[in-house]
């Protein structure tokens, strides 16, 4: 991490409960599980599961996706983490499975979890790591697709995707967004 810079808060988006544990919409949680150097612990005051890694705070909001901003903002306020040091890790159906895209800011697109965070911080200047989950096959609705478990082909490469996502987060924490964007915003695994 940058000496003297504020710490990072990394928020992995997902939904609580066994029903959602291995679904595409929970890839943010799965990426944080791959990253964490200690077990997550439930923190009711932050509406989430919290851990530490490389000096950063990690949170898996347990508010359900559409209210993720409540949990992320609570932890950021408590530890005085500015919005530009909050990294949101989320699924993206517009990216091919396994593709990573790191951005320092932008709109939420159609992602309600990211939208909740942007609303709670009142800015679009919140960094994010989007992890591609691919588009739903026709005629499947996007809502059904993101809440479905990974397919057999995806499960076969999921560990590599999660390991690469965790490595991208580590590069962000250590060297910053620009370095990570140069290294990971490329096609494929």
Regions found by a protein language model. Name each.
Residues 1-105, 114-129, 136-141, 148, ...:
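Nucleotide and nucleotide-moiety/phosphate-recognizing core
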